[in-house]
Amino acid sequence: MSDKHINLVIVTGMSGAGKTVAIQSFEDLGYFTIDNMPPALVPKFLELIEQTNENRRVALVVDMRSRLFFKEINSTLDSIESNPSIDFRILFLDATDGELVSRYKETRRSHPLAADGRVLDGIRLERELLSPLKSMSQHVVDTTKLTPRQLRKTISDQFSEGSNQASFRIEVMSFGFKYGLPLDADLVFDVRFLPNPYYQVELREKTGLDEDVFNYVMSHPESEVFYKHLLNLIVPILPAYQKEGKSVLTVAIGCTGGQHRSVAFAHCLAESLATDWSVNESHRDQNRRKETVNRS
Protein backbone atom coordinates (compact mmCIF):
# COMPACT_ATOMS: atom_id res chain seq x y z
CA MET A 1 0.00 0.00 0.00
CA SER A 2 1.35 3.41 -1.00
CA ASP A 3 2.02 6.03 1.64
CA LYS A 4 -0.51 8.19 -0.24
CA HIS A 5 -3.28 5.70 0.48
CA ILE A 6 -5.71 6.01 3.34
CA ASN A 7 -6.25 2.86 5.36
CA LEU A 8 -9.89 3.17 6.44
CA VAL A 9 -11.86 0.90 8.75
CA ILE A 10 -15.58 1.51 9.12
CA VAL A 11 -16.76 0.11 12.43
CA THR A 12 -20.46 -0.69 12.54
CA GLY A 13 -22.85 -3.27 13.88
CA MET A 14 -25.49 -3.83 16.51
CA SER A 15 -25.97 -1.31 19.29
CA GLY A 16 -24.49 -2.79 22.46
CA ALA A 17 -22.17 -5.17 20.59
CA GLY A 18 -18.97 -3.39 21.63
CA LYS A 19 -18.31 -0.52 19.21
CA THR A 20 -17.06 1.76 22.00
CA VAL A 21 -14.45 -0.81 23.03
CA ALA A 22 -13.59 -1.30 19.37
CA ILE A 23 -12.97 2.35 18.57
CA GLN A 24 -10.84 2.70 21.72
CA SER A 25 -8.83 -0.30 20.53
CA PHE A 26 -8.21 1.32 17.15
CA GLU A 27 -7.05 4.47 18.92
CA ASP A 28 -4.58 2.36 20.90
CA LEU A 29 -3.35 0.91 17.60
CA GLY A 30 -2.53 4.40 16.36
CA TYR A 31 -5.57 5.04 14.19
CA PHE A 32 -7.24 8.44 13.92
CA THR A 33 -10.71 7.70 15.29
CA ILE A 34 -14.15 9.33 15.26
CA ASP A 35 -17.25 7.89 16.92
CA ASN A 36 -20.82 8.30 15.59
CA MET A 37 -19.85 9.72 12.19
CA PRO A 38 -22.82 10.60 9.93
CA PRO A 39 -22.27 8.73 6.63
CA ALA A 40 -22.77 11.86 4.50
CA LEU A 41 -19.78 13.53 6.17
CA VAL A 42 -17.35 10.65 5.58
CA PRO A 43 -16.28 11.51 1.98
CA LYS A 44 -15.60 15.15 2.86
CA PHE A 45 -13.65 14.13 5.94
CA LEU A 46 -11.52 11.73 3.87
CA GLU A 47 -10.82 14.54 1.39
CA LEU A 48 -9.40 16.58 4.25
CA ILE A 49 -7.22 13.65 5.33
CA GLU A 50 -5.90 13.31 1.76
CA GLN A 51 -4.82 16.95 1.78
CA THR A 52 -2.67 16.59 4.88
CA ASN A 53 0.35 14.60 5.95
CA GLU A 54 -1.40 13.48 9.10
CA ASN A 55 -2.15 9.92 10.17
CA ARG A 56 -3.60 8.02 7.20
CA ARG A 57 -4.94 5.14 9.28
CA VAL A 58 -8.52 6.03 10.10
CA ALA A 59 -11.30 4.20 11.97
CA LEU A 60 -14.83 5.60 11.95
CA VAL A 61 -17.89 4.35 13.82
CA VAL A 62 -20.95 4.61 11.58
CA ASP A 63 -24.12 3.15 13.04
CA MET A 64 -27.83 3.56 13.67
CA ARG A 65 -27.34 6.43 16.07
CA SER A 66 -27.22 8.57 12.94
CA ARG A 67 -30.91 7.68 12.46
CA LEU A 68 -32.10 9.28 9.20
CA PHE A 69 -28.54 10.01 8.09
CA PHE A 70 -27.81 6.28 8.05
CA LYS A 71 -29.93 5.91 4.90
CA GLU A 72 -27.03 7.48 3.01
CA ILE A 73 -24.60 4.69 3.93
CA ASN A 74 -24.83 2.94 0.53
CA SER A 75 -24.01 6.06 -1.48
CA THR A 76 -21.20 6.81 0.96
CA LEU A 77 -19.69 3.35 0.51
CA ASP A 78 -19.98 3.67 -3.28
CA SER A 79 -18.10 6.97 -3.11
CA ILE A 80 -15.35 5.46 -0.98
CA GLU A 81 -15.03 2.39 -3.16
CA SER A 82 -14.60 4.51 -6.29
CA ASN A 83 -11.66 6.37 -4.77
CA PRO A 84 -8.42 4.52 -5.67
CA SER A 85 -6.49 6.24 -2.87
CA ILE A 86 -8.64 4.65 -0.15
CA ASP A 87 -8.29 1.07 1.03
CA PHE A 88 -11.25 0.35 3.25
CA ARG A 89 -12.69 -2.50 5.23
CA ILE A 90 -15.88 -2.87 7.23
CA LEU A 91 -15.82 -4.35 10.72
CA PHE A 92 -19.28 -5.49 11.83
CA LEU A 93 -19.81 -6.27 15.51
CA ASP A 94 -22.69 -8.55 16.40
CA ALA A 95 -24.14 -10.46 19.35
CA THR A 96 -27.22 -12.55 20.03
CA ASP A 97 -30.49 -10.80 20.81
CA GLY A 98 -30.48 -12.26 24.31
CA GLU A 99 -26.98 -10.98 25.05
CA LEU A 100 -27.79 -7.52 23.73
CA VAL A 101 -30.93 -7.33 25.87
CA SER A 102 -28.88 -8.38 28.89
CA ARG A 103 -26.29 -5.67 28.22
CA TYR A 104 -28.97 -3.00 27.88
CA LYS A 105 -30.56 -4.07 31.14
CA GLU A 106 -27.18 -3.92 32.85
CA THR A 107 -26.37 -0.41 31.62
CA ARG A 108 -30.00 0.83 31.85
CA ARG A 109 -29.61 2.68 28.58
CA SER A 110 -32.32 2.93 25.92
CA HIS A 111 -31.93 1.41 22.48
CA PRO A 112 -31.72 4.06 19.69
CA LEU A 113 -34.50 2.37 17.70
CA ALA A 114 -36.76 1.37 20.60
CA ALA A 115 -39.32 4.15 20.28
CA ASP A 116 -41.69 2.59 22.80
CA GLY A 117 -38.92 1.55 25.17
CA ARG A 118 -39.01 -2.15 24.24
CA VAL A 119 -35.34 -3.03 23.78
CA LEU A 120 -35.97 -6.31 21.96
CA ASP A 121 -38.14 -4.60 19.33
CA GLY A 122 -35.39 -2.06 18.73
CA ILE A 123 -32.79 -4.82 18.39
CA ARG A 124 -34.89 -6.73 15.87
CA LEU A 125 -35.51 -3.63 13.76
CA GLU A 126 -31.84 -2.71 13.84
CA ARG A 127 -30.80 -6.22 12.83
CA GLU A 128 -33.14 -6.06 9.84
CA LEU A 129 -31.87 -2.66 8.75
CA LEU A 130 -28.21 -3.64 9.13
CA SER A 131 -28.49 -7.01 7.37
CA PRO A 132 -27.32 -5.71 3.95
CA LEU A 133 -24.35 -3.94 5.54
CA LYS A 134 -23.39 -7.07 7.46
CA SER A 135 -23.33 -9.08 4.24
CA MET A 136 -20.88 -6.54 2.76
CA SER A 137 -18.51 -6.62 5.75
CA GLN A 138 -15.04 -8.12 5.44
CA HIS A 139 -14.82 -8.73 9.19
CA VAL A 140 -17.75 -9.94 11.31
CA VAL A 141 -17.05 -10.46 15.01
CA ASP A 142 -19.58 -12.09 17.34
CA THR A 143 -18.98 -10.54 20.76
CA THR A 144 -21.60 -12.62 22.60
CA LYS A 145 -19.03 -14.55 24.60
CA LEU A 146 -16.17 -12.04 24.42
CA THR A 147 -14.98 -9.91 27.30
CA PRO A 148 -13.84 -6.36 26.45
CA ARG A 149 -10.25 -7.55 26.82
CA GLN A 150 -10.83 -10.39 24.37
CA LEU A 151 -12.45 -8.03 21.88
CA ARG A 152 -9.46 -5.69 22.07
CA LYS A 153 -7.17 -8.66 21.45
CA THR A 154 -9.25 -9.75 18.44
CA ILE A 155 -9.08 -6.28 16.90
CA SER A 156 -5.36 -6.01 17.58
CA ASP A 157 -4.74 -9.36 15.89
CA GLN A 158 -6.74 -8.40 12.79
CA PHE A 159 -5.85 -4.74 12.34
CA SER A 160 -2.42 -4.01 13.82
CA GLU A 161 0.23 -3.63 11.14
CA GLY A 162 2.59 -6.28 12.40
CA SER A 163 5.35 -6.10 15.02
CA ASN A 164 5.28 -5.53 18.74
CA GLN A 165 5.39 -1.79 18.18
CA ALA A 166 2.01 -1.51 16.47
CA SER A 167 -0.20 -2.20 19.47
CA PHE A 168 1.94 -2.10 22.60
CA ARG A 169 4.10 0.65 24.04
CA ILE A 170 6.36 0.74 27.08
CA GLU A 171 6.71 3.92 29.12
CA VAL A 172 9.94 3.90 31.12
CA MET A 173 10.09 6.71 33.64
CA SER A 174 12.24 7.83 36.55
CA PHE A 175 10.90 9.57 39.63
CA GLY A 176 11.79 10.68 43.14
CA PHE A 177 10.12 8.95 46.08
CA LYS A 178 10.17 12.24 48.01
CA TYR A 179 7.73 13.65 45.45
CA GLY A 180 5.35 10.69 45.52
CA LEU A 181 4.75 7.53 43.54
CA PRO A 182 3.59 7.86 39.91
CA LEU A 183 -0.13 7.12 39.93
CA ASP A 184 -0.07 5.45 36.51
CA ALA A 185 2.86 3.09 37.15
CA ASP A 186 2.31 -0.63 36.52
CA LEU A 187 5.73 -1.77 37.77
CA VAL A 188 7.79 0.16 40.33
CA PHE A 189 11.44 -0.49 41.18
CA ASP A 190 13.44 1.13 43.98
CA VAL A 191 17.14 1.92 43.40
CA ARG A 192 17.73 3.88 46.61
CA PHE A 193 20.06 1.12 47.81
CA LEU A 194 22.71 2.23 45.29
CA PRO A 195 25.49 4.72 46.12
CA ASN A 196 24.13 8.25 45.70
CA PRO A 197 25.94 10.66 43.34
CA TYR A 198 24.38 13.53 45.29
CA TYR A 199 27.18 13.18 47.82
CA GLN A 200 29.82 13.66 45.13
CA VAL A 201 30.15 17.44 44.92
CA GLU A 202 31.16 17.43 41.26
CA LEU A 203 28.05 15.36 40.37
CA ARG A 204 25.45 16.94 42.63
CA GLU A 205 24.02 19.45 40.16
CA LYS A 206 24.04 17.03 37.22
CA THR A 207 21.54 14.30 36.32
CA GLY A 208 21.69 10.64 35.42
CA LEU A 209 21.70 11.61 31.74
CA ASP A 210 25.13 13.21 32.10
CA GLU A 211 27.84 10.76 31.13
CA ASP A 212 29.90 11.03 34.31
CA VAL A 213 26.84 10.53 36.54
CA PHE A 214 25.58 7.66 34.38
CA ASN A 215 28.96 5.92 34.56
CA TYR A 216 29.18 6.49 38.31
CA VAL A 217 25.77 4.89 38.89
CA MET A 218 26.04 1.98 36.49
CA SER A 219 29.66 1.01 37.25
CA HIS A 220 29.00 -0.16 40.81
CA PRO A 221 28.83 -3.95 41.23
CA GLU A 222 25.42 -3.63 42.88
CA SER A 223 24.13 -1.81 39.80
CA GLU A 224 25.40 -4.46 37.42
CA VAL A 225 23.79 -7.27 39.41
CA PHE A 226 20.48 -5.45 39.86
CA TYR A 227 20.27 -4.40 36.22
CA LYS A 228 20.81 -7.95 35.06
CA HIS A 229 18.01 -9.18 37.32
CA LEU A 230 15.79 -6.30 36.23
CA LEU A 231 16.10 -7.25 32.57
CA ASN A 232 15.59 -10.92 33.36
CA LEU A 233 12.37 -10.02 35.16
CA ILE A 234 10.89 -7.52 32.71
CA VAL A 235 11.76 -8.90 29.27
CA PRO A 236 10.02 -12.30 29.61
CA ILE A 237 6.75 -10.79 30.87
CA LEU A 238 6.32 -8.16 28.14
CA PRO A 239 4.65 -10.57 25.66
CA ALA A 240 2.23 -11.61 28.41
CA TYR A 241 1.21 -7.99 29.05
CA GLN A 242 0.74 -7.50 25.31
CA LYS A 243 -1.30 -10.69 24.99
CA GLU A 244 -3.48 -9.58 27.89
CA GLY A 245 -4.52 -6.61 25.75
CA LYS A 246 -2.61 -3.87 27.51
CA SER A 247 -1.69 -1.02 25.15
CA VAL A 248 0.72 0.84 27.47
CA LEU A 249 2.92 -0.60 30.22
CA THR A 250 4.48 1.97 32.54
CA VAL A 251 7.69 0.94 34.28
CA ALA A 252 8.78 3.41 36.96
CA ILE A 253 12.20 3.47 38.60
CA GLY A 254 12.63 5.60 41.69
CA CYS A 255 15.40 6.99 43.86
CA THR A 256 15.25 9.62 46.58
CA GLY A 257 15.03 12.78 44.47
CA GLY A 258 14.62 11.40 40.96
CA GLN A 259 17.72 13.18 39.66
CA HIS A 260 20.61 10.72 39.51
CA ARG A 261 20.24 6.98 40.13
CA SER A 262 16.71 6.46 38.84
CA VAL A 263 17.40 8.59 35.77
CA ALA A 264 20.48 6.57 34.85
CA PHE A 265 18.68 3.26 35.36
CA ALA A 266 15.56 4.34 33.45
CA HIS A 267 17.68 5.56 30.54
CA CYS A 268 19.64 2.32 30.42
CA LEU A 269 16.47 0.21 30.59
CA ALA A 270 14.72 2.23 27.88
CA GLU A 271 17.65 1.80 25.50
CA SER A 272 17.78 -1.96 26.13
CA LEU A 273 14.05 -2.47 25.55
CA ALA A 274 13.93 -0.21 22.49
CA THR A 275 15.72 -2.82 20.38
CA ASP A 276 12.54 -4.93 20.30
CA TRP A 277 9.70 -2.73 21.54
CA SER A 278 8.21 0.72 21.14
CA VAL A 279 9.55 2.66 24.13
CA ASN A 280 9.07 6.17 25.46
CA GLU A 281 11.52 7.47 28.07
CA SER A 282 10.68 10.24 30.55
CA HIS A 283 12.15 11.66 33.76
CA ARG A 284 9.50 13.20 35.96
CA ASP A 285 11.62 14.81 38.67
CA GLN A 286 15.14 15.18 37.27
CA ASN A 287 14.95 19.00 37.34
CA ARG A 288 12.68 19.30 40.38
CA ARG A 289 15.50 20.20 42.81
CA LYS A 290 16.85 22.94 40.51
CA GLU A 291 13.38 24.42 40.13
CA THR A 292 12.93 24.42 43.91
CA VAL A 293 16.26 26.18 44.42
CA ASN A 294 15.44 28.80 41.78
CA ARG A 295 12.11 29.62 43.43
CA SER A 296 13.59 30.00 46.91
From Swiss-Prot:
| A Pfam family matched in the record | PapZ_C
Which superkingdom heads the taxonomic lineage of this protein's source?
Bacteria
Question: Where does this protein hold GTP?
Answer: 63-66
Keyword annotations: ATP-binding, GTP-binding, Nucleotide-binding
Q: What is this protein called?
A: Nucleotide-binding protein SPy_0652/M5005_Spy0539
InterPro entries named among the record's database cross-references: P-loop_NTPase, RapZ-like, RapZ-like_N, RapZ_C
Q: Which organism is it from?
A: Streptococcus pyogenes serotype M1
List the NCBIfam families hit by this protein, alphabetically.
Answer: PRK05416.1 (NF003828)
At which positions is ATP bound?
Answer: 13-20
Q: What family is this protein classified in?
A: Belongs to the RapZ-like family.
Protein purpose: Displays ATPase and GTPase activities.
Note the HAMAP family from the entry.
RapZ_like (MF_00636)
GO terms for molecular function, please? ATP binding; GTP binding
| The UniProt record lists the keyword 4Fe-4S | no
